[in-house]
Amino acid sequence: MNKDQFRGSHLYSAIQLVMAIAIVAALCGCQSTYYSVWEQLGKHKRDLLRDYVQDASKEQQKAKVEFKDALTRLKEITGFDGGKLEEAYRAVEKDYERCSDRAASIRSRIKDIEDVSAALFKEWEKEITTYSSDTLRSSSKSKLRETRQRYDALHTALQKSSDSMTPILARLKDQALFLKHNLNAQAIGALKGEVVSIEGDIQKLIAEMNTSISRADEFINGLQ
């Protein structure tokens, strides 16, 4: 191993160690240590907030596709004309599970955003008091106020779309269970009215997600 390889391997090991400490700190609930470790890697709270918002936006993009797929599957089943009903039920069940997992992932991203934004704003408020320049202090206060306003709009949109998933998931689960216990043409026919109703809910959810994604883009651009 040459010197460059030796230095590279040790740098990689050091980064792995620091990241491991960050993960342990997060699991133990010690946020200050968690953020401190990330700062050692060159990622400050502002950078983490940007990353978390981007992650949430990507998760919502995926959720849009998965909820649309679930709706498409239900529509196909209501027009089911013979074939293997057991396979149809399994497909609906998997759609529900995918949507449920995605919703849980989005809720987790929102929690990350809430935690790091609270820490960032607290730190920002504290640092504002250390300015000796009235002009710079006033400018920083104004920037903080604008950032908070954009954050509030983003958080409201994120929470609204996340909350809208809950009743839709409950209805998807109901339909999967109904099919499980009633694998016959009569049961399929009984779902038609439900599918028409849930279609409107999913379209509304997708519109809310689009709004949330737009708010995320606006917020990220404002952090540049």
Which residues make up each language-model segment?
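Long amphipathic all-alpha helical oligomerization modules
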Residues: 34, 159, 166-224
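Long amphipathic alpha-helical segments with strong coiled-coil/leucine-zipper propensity
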Residues: 64, 75-142
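Extended amphipathic alpha-helical interaction segments
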Residues: 109-189
